[in-house]
Protein backbone atom coordinates (compact mmCIF):
# COMPACT_ATOMS: atom_id res chain seq x y z
CA UNK A 1 0.00 0.00 0.00
CA UNK A 2 1.35 3.38 -0.92
CA UNK A 3 1.36 6.39 1.39
CA UNK A 4 -1.20 8.09 -0.87
CA UNK A 5 -3.57 5.11 -0.57
CA UNK A 6 -3.08 5.10 3.19
CA UNK A 7 -3.90 8.81 3.43
CA UNK A 8 -7.07 8.25 1.36
CA UNK A 9 -7.96 5.38 3.69
CA UNK A 10 -7.54 7.64 6.75
CA UNK A 11 -9.61 10.41 5.17
CA UNK A 12 -12.42 7.97 4.40
CA UNK A 13 -12.32 6.62 7.97
CA UNK A 14 -12.72 10.14 9.42
CA UNK A 15 -16.16 10.45 7.84
CA UNK A 16 -17.48 7.13 9.15
CA UNK A 17 -18.96 8.45 12.40
CA UNK A 18 -20.49 11.71 11.25
CA UNK A 19 -23.04 9.97 9.02
CA UNK A 20 -24.41 7.34 11.38
CA UNK A 21 -24.93 8.88 14.82
CA UNK A 22 -24.84 12.17 16.63
CA UNK A 23 -22.30 11.01 19.20
CA UNK A 24 -22.59 14.09 21.41
CA UNK A 25 -26.32 13.47 21.86
CA UNK A 26 -25.65 9.79 22.48
CA UNK A 27 -23.10 10.63 25.19
CA UNK A 28 -25.52 13.05 26.89
CA UNK A 29 -28.27 10.41 26.84
CA UNK A 30 -25.87 7.79 28.25
CA UNK A 31 -24.66 10.07 31.06
CA UNK A 32 -28.24 11.10 31.94
CA UNK A 33 -29.44 7.50 32.11
CA UNK A 34 -26.44 6.52 34.25
CA UNK A 35 -27.46 9.26 36.70
CA UNK A 36 -31.03 7.90 36.76
CA UNK A 37 -29.72 4.39 37.49
CA UNK A 38 -27.51 5.64 40.34
CA UNK A 39 -30.44 7.61 41.80
CA UNK A 40 -32.70 4.54 41.60
CA UNK A 41 -30.11 2.39 43.38
CA UNK A 42 -29.69 5.01 46.11
CA UNK A 43 -33.48 5.10 46.54
CA UNK A 44 -33.84 1.29 46.61
CA UNK A 45 -31.10 0.93 49.21
CA UNK A 46 -31.85 4.07 51.27
CA UNK A 47 -33.32 2.29 54.29
CA UNK A 48 -30.34 -0.10 54.42
CA UNK A 49 -27.88 2.77 54.14
CA UNK A 50 -29.69 4.65 56.93
CA UNK A 51 -29.57 1.51 59.10
CA UNK A 52 -25.82 1.20 58.47
CA UNK A 53 -26.17 -2.17 56.70
CA UNK A 54 -24.85 -0.92 53.35
CA UNK A 55 -22.29 1.72 52.43
CA UNK A 56 -22.56 3.27 48.96
CA UNK A 57 -19.74 5.24 47.39
CA UNK A 58 -19.25 6.63 43.90
CA UNK A 59 -16.35 5.54 41.70
CA UNK A 60 -15.19 7.40 38.60
CA UNK A 61 -13.94 5.52 35.59
CA UNK A 62 -12.55 6.73 32.27
CA UNK A 63 -13.95 5.05 29.18
CA UNK A 64 -12.54 5.32 25.68
CA UNK A 65 -14.96 4.57 22.87
CA UNK A 66 -14.67 4.91 19.13
CA UNK A 67 -16.48 8.03 17.96
CA UNK A 68 -16.73 9.40 21.50
CA UNK A 69 -13.12 9.50 22.58
CA UNK A 70 -12.23 9.56 26.27
CA UNK A 71 -14.84 10.51 28.87
CA UNK A 72 -15.52 9.98 32.57
CA UNK A 73 -18.47 8.06 34.02
CA UNK A 74 -19.56 7.37 37.57
CA UNK A 75 -20.28 3.93 38.93
CA UNK A 76 -21.09 2.75 42.43
CA UNK A 77 -19.40 0.60 45.02
CA UNK A 78 -21.62 -1.18 47.54
CA UNK A 79 -20.17 -2.60 50.74
CA UNK A 80 -22.11 -4.80 53.14
CA UNK A 81 -20.82 -7.44 55.50
CA UNK A 82 -17.57 -8.61 53.97
CA UNK A 83 -18.91 -8.20 50.41
CA UNK A 84 -18.00 -5.55 47.84
CA UNK A 85 -20.18 -5.08 44.77
CA UNK A 86 -19.07 -2.88 41.88
CA UNK A 87 -21.66 -1.29 39.60
CA UNK A 88 -19.51 -0.40 36.61
CA UNK A 89 -20.49 1.38 33.38
CA UNK A 90 -19.06 -0.52 30.39
CA UNK A 91 -19.96 1.71 27.46
CA UNK A 92 -22.56 3.05 25.07
CA UNK A 93 -21.22 1.82 21.71
CA UNK A 94 -23.09 -1.46 21.70
CA UNK A 95 -25.26 -3.38 19.28
CA UNK A 96 -28.87 -3.61 20.44
CA UNK A 97 -28.64 -1.20 23.37
CA UNK A 98 -27.57 2.33 24.21
CA UNK A 99 -25.51 1.34 27.21
CA UNK A 100 -24.32 -1.41 29.49
CA UNK A 101 -23.52 -1.51 33.19
CA UNK A 102 -22.06 -4.57 34.91
CA UNK A 103 -22.95 -5.49 38.48
CA UNK A 104 -19.85 -7.36 39.64
CA UNK A 105 -19.75 -9.42 42.80
CA UNK A 106 -17.44 -12.04 44.24
CA UNK A 107 -19.23 -14.96 42.54
CA UNK A 108 -21.01 -13.59 39.47
CA UNK A 109 -21.55 -10.65 37.14
CA UNK A 110 -24.95 -9.46 35.96
CA UNK A 111 -25.49 -7.19 32.96
CA UNK A 112 -27.82 -4.21 32.91
CA UNK A 113 -28.64 -2.88 29.45
CA UNK A 114 -30.24 0.40 28.46
CA UNK A 115 -32.85 -0.72 25.93
CA UNK A 116 -36.27 0.20 24.59
CA UNK A 117 -38.68 0.10 27.53
CA UNK A 118 -41.04 -2.17 25.59
CA UNK A 119 -38.36 -4.68 24.52
CA UNK A 120 -38.25 -8.17 26.00
CA UNK A 121 -35.31 -9.30 23.86
CA UNK A 122 -32.84 -7.85 21.35
CA UNK A 123 -34.26 -6.69 18.03
CA UNK A 124 -31.24 -6.86 15.76
CA UNK A 125 -30.99 -7.47 12.02
CA UNK A 126 -28.06 -8.34 9.79
CA UNK A 127 -27.66 -7.36 6.18
CA UNK A 128 -25.14 -8.62 3.65
CA UNK A 129 -24.17 -5.86 1.23
CA UNK A 130 -23.73 -6.55 -2.49
CA UNK A 131 -19.94 -6.63 -1.97
CA UNK A 132 -20.28 -9.30 0.75
CA UNK A 133 -19.83 -7.18 3.87
CA UNK A 134 -22.03 -7.94 6.85
CA UNK A 135 -23.77 -5.01 8.54
CA UNK A 136 -25.50 -5.42 11.90
CA UNK A 137 -28.04 -2.86 13.10
CA UNK A 138 -31.13 -2.49 15.24
CA UNK A 139 -34.05 -3.76 13.18
CA UNK A 140 -36.08 -0.74 14.25
CA UNK A 141 -33.59 1.67 12.69
CA UNK A 142 -31.75 4.78 13.87
CA UNK A 143 -34.23 6.26 16.33
CA UNK A 144 -32.45 6.31 19.66
CA UNK A 145 -33.59 9.83 20.62
CA UNK A 146 -37.30 8.94 20.20
CA UNK A 147 -37.26 5.75 22.27
CA UNK A 148 -38.33 5.56 25.90
CA UNK A 149 -35.16 3.93 27.26
CA UNK A 150 -35.13 1.79 30.40
CA UNK A 151 -32.53 -0.20 32.33
CA UNK A 152 -33.18 -3.95 32.16
CA UNK A 153 -31.42 -7.06 33.38
CA UNK A 154 -30.14 -9.06 30.41
CA UNK A 155 -29.63 -12.81 30.47
CA UNK A 156 -26.49 -14.28 28.95
CA UNK A 157 -26.23 -15.14 25.24
CA UNK A 158 -27.14 -16.99 23.13
CA UNK A 159 -30.82 -16.48 24.06
CA UNK A 160 -30.83 -13.00 25.57
CA UNK A 161 -34.00 -11.93 27.37
CA UNK A 162 -34.68 -8.67 29.20
CA UNK A 163 -36.25 -8.32 32.65
CA UNK A 164 -37.64 -5.05 34.00
CA UNK A 165 -35.34 -3.49 36.60
CA UNK A 166 -37.02 -2.42 39.83
CA UNK A 167 -36.10 -2.67 43.52
CA UNK A 168 -36.98 -6.37 43.81
CA UNK A 169 -35.08 -7.28 40.64
CA UNK A 170 -32.09 -5.30 41.92
CA UNK A 171 -32.18 -7.11 45.28
CA UNK A 172 -32.17 -10.43 43.36
CA UNK A 173 -29.18 -9.23 41.31
CA UNK A 174 -27.24 -8.39 44.48
CA UNK A 175 -27.95 -11.80 45.97
CA UNK A 176 -26.91 -13.56 42.73
CA UNK A 177 -23.60 -11.73 42.40
CA UNK A 178 -22.76 -12.52 46.03
CA UNK A 179 -24.03 -16.11 46.22
CA UNK A 180 -23.51 -17.24 42.64
Positions of predicted regions on the chain:
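Contiguous, amphipathic alpha-helical segments that mediate oligomerization or scaffolding
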Residues: 17-62
Amino acid sequence: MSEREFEAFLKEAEGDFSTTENWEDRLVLWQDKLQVLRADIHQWLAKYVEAGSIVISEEEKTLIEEGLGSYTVKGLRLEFGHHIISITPVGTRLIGSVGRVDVIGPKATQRLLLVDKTASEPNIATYITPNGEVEVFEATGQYFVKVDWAWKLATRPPEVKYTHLDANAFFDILMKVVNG
